[in-house]
Amino acid sequence: MDEQAFWYIIASCMEDGDSIDEKLASLKQLLIAMPDEDLIAFQEMIDHMMMQAYRWGLWGAAHIMMGGCSDEMFEHFRAGLIMKGKDVYEAAVVEPDTLAEVGEIAECEDLLYLACEVYEDRNDDGAIYDRFHEEAKVTPDGDSFDEHDTRYLKQEYPRLWEIYCAEQV
């Protein structure tokens, strides 16, 4: 599966419902209709997109938007970012402050396991999980940030800061 096919699948469920749960239910139906090879390829693309977004700059944006962001929260944030679609995802990976134009990013842990769950249900094979979900990178790409350095955060993420933190200063 190439990126174009992956993003087409994500876009196909974007219009279904208002909540992330409704969108995931729609995505699950699309995944159920796929052959096993495509399920595996879809999961590989999820993992690829998660790693591509594993960046300190994006983590800083998530920290501002969520009022703090642990490792696990950042993982779920990145999954939610994927569910926002190709344009939002790609813009945020390059320039995280563009998320000021997007609004809330729902944490979306279920996306990380959905294709594996469909595969397991179909094949009664839980070993599929062992193939995926390994963090290949020890640390995110880019320069780390000090979550308490408000001057840096305000400078690096001016639009997000204005929306989420301006009242704090």
Map each language-model feature to its residues:
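Long, solvent-exposed, polar/charged low-complexity segments
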Residues: 7-8, 13, 126-169
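Residue-level detector of well-ordered alpha-helical segments, enriched
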Residues: 2-5, 22-26, 38, 42, ...
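Hydrophobic/aromatic-rich, well-ordered segments within soluble, folded domains that form packed cores
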Residues: 63-93, 99
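A glycine-rich, hydrophobic loop/mini-helix early in the fold
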Residues: 29-68
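Short, hydrophobic/amphipathic alpha-helical patches that form generic packing surfaces
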Residues: 7-12, 44-48, 52, 72-86, ...
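N-terminal, charge-rich interaction modules
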Residues: 1-29, 34, 167
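An exposed acidic His-Trp-rich patch
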Residues: 88-121
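Terminal interaction module
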Residues: 82, 110, 119, 152-157, ...
